[in-house]
Amino acid sequence: MTDSSKVIVCDNGTGFVKCGFARSNFPASIFPSMVGRPILRSEEKFDNVEIKDIMVGDEASKLRSMLQITYPLDNGIVRNWEDAEHVWNYTFFEKLKVDPKDCKILLTEPPMNPLANREKMVQVMFEKYGFKAAYIAIQAVLTLYAQGLLTGVVVDSGDGVTHIVPVYEGFSLPHLTRRLNVAGRDVTRYLIKLLLLRGYVFNRTADFETVRQIKEKFCYVGYDLELEKRLALETTTLVEKYTLPDGRVIPIGAERFEAPECMFNPALVDQESVGVGELVFDCINKADIDTRAEFYNHIVLSGGSTMYPGLPSRLEKEIKRLYFERVAKGNKVSMQKFKCRIEDPPRRKHMVFLGGAVLAEIMKDKTAFWMNKSEYEEQGPRVLRKCF
């Protein structure tokens, strides 16, 4: 085992776990962050897969129609530690096939994560798995590393939570960080609701995965909502057909752009917040005046929920509109000097992991950066000061 392969990088998302080793260009394994327990133990095997009392990740996803599915993470925070440990067991022993006692681990976490959550995570890594050393990195900072930047604003939207995080010279700025509890899972739920209004009922946990696939295949963000609504109403150009697992074919029309709209208008999913465009504008506008130009120039998208076609151009349009109304106060001359650039790297779905793999490779021999096991045994949770 080389030194790099002894450093595990694990990005635990609300929807998916991306795990692998330092220096790799792609996660060694990506699987759903879900735990399933059989509803009925009527048979031992199904579709050549053994039905076990606890099923995790890909195997749970495969048999999801027969299982009671739970997600250990919600809004980026671990809510169920027992299930989280099942997910980590699956990660280390089934997927990566490593002995944690020989390895170091780099974990990721969302900004504004509760301290208790972070302390418990370190405790589990050292006491249950016996890792030699651990490091916890903030996801947004890793995204910028992967993009080759030290300063910028990261719009990180995964399955459970969306964060807008300004990072200056490699340090995230917590006082300017904005959090929006609308992300991929909410878009899927909203799409279920829109399809329900059309008479298609999806209510089991298995159906949730089906609708998620519909969302990933067909949804996009509309640049001009009025135009999209007219197109949906007066023509059939937006209609796409999707074949459900039971063979039924359903048409998807206006729902394609209506579902992701909840990210720009959270009131649609009963969240009291402004949309993602206004949050980015607000966060940059409250930053020091001499950093704003650089922030506007480096708005980096990250996470699976930024993959919708049309999202980068709509975000740019929203930011420019708000700048024109609130900063330029309608002055078209000052708008000519305003530069706003949205960076949408093609591999942004895995940006956090890629940044983690880069950082872990740089740090692997530098003991000063890591929290090691002996320090943890001596100091307890206070050892976290090394990371933050």
Curated annotation (Swiss-Prot):
Pfam entry (one): Actin
SUPFAM superfamilies: Actin-like ATPase domain
Lineage: superkingdom: Eukaryota
Signal peptide bounds: none
MF terms (GO), sorted A to Z: actin binding; ATP binding
Alphabetically ordered keywords of this record: Actin-binding, ATP-binding, Cell projection, Cytoplasm, Cytoskeleton, Nucleotide-binding
Residues holding ATP: G158, D159, G160, R212, Q213, I214, K215, E216, G303, G304, S305, T306, M307, Y308
Database matches in CDD domains: ASKHA_NBD_Arp2
A Gene Ontology cellular-component term: cytoplasm
InterPro entries given in the database record: Actin, Actin/actin-like_CS, ATPase_NBD
Compartment list: Cytoplasm, Cytoskeleton; Cell projection
Example of a GO biological process term: phagocytosis
Cited function: Functions as ATP-binding component of the Arp2/3 complex which is involved in regulation of actin polymerization and together with an activating nucleation-promoting factor (NPF) mediates the formation of branched actin networks. Seems to contact the pointed end of the daughter actin filament.
Protein family membership: Belongs to the actin family. ARP2 subfamily.
Subunit description: Component of the Arp2/3 complex.
PANTHER family: ACTIN (PTHR11937)
Protein name as catalogued: Actin-related protein 2
Organism: Acanthamoeba castellanii
Gene: arp2
